[in-house]
Amino acid sequence: MRDTTWVNGEPAEQLRADDRGLLYGDGLFETLAVRRGHVRHLALHLARLARGCERLHIAMPAQPLLAAELQALCAGRERALLRLTLTRGPAQARGYRPTGSELPTRVATVAAWPAPVSLPFRTRLSDVRLACQPLLAGLKHLNRLEQVLAQQGAAAAGVHEALMLDSHGGLVCGSMGNVYVRIRGQWLTPPIIDCGVAGITRQRLLEGAGGAGFPLREEQMGVAGLARAECIAISNVRLGLQVVHWHEGRELGVDPVLARVQEALDADGQ
């Protein structure tokens, strides 16, 4: 099936040129998986979107409306990838300052599920540092230039993913997902405090979705921690929980527990 886009609940492929999402990146987005016409973990994604709207003072559309639109858009799709973008809407005045009277624009696109990535999965440390801005930390906002630059560097280096540090040298995430590192048998993930996206899979794993065999905890680490990593994994909606086979040219171990964790994540479809 071809890609399908709805704008504000209607089939369309164009936005107004003065939409603040285009002008300033003034908005948020969610990427969701679709299985057998069902949008997976929709409640968790809409809850994160609502938190972002509250932080940015964007009027959040009614969640039942969004849920109904997304389920209708995805009806009949066996397996697909769905992106929901919410902008503050068309500008009501020139300049950065919103008037408060903007009407949000919602854009939903459903596309075929991407082909599997080639293996072995390789990562490198990005030359791009994430700027620290606690007001935006955790949000999946539309300003993604740091990730664009990091992915350009990854492509030039011939690797799949770039692991990103903040301006203080702390590990935060990958350019396209959260990161998990096993050190001395313990799986760790960096806290999302000053920057980075608080992913839905990461949230589920911290809440115990991986089962008793995958006790995950937050811990700050930097380059030295990565150097001691026995295993590394990346998560996002498309990849699931992806094992990293090589980091910076060093071959890593593969923890067999990750396959069981992925099975547990897949089984919990909500």
Describe the residue ranges of each PLM region:
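Helix-start/capping segments and mature chain N-termini
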Residues: 1-64, 68-72, 76, 87, ...
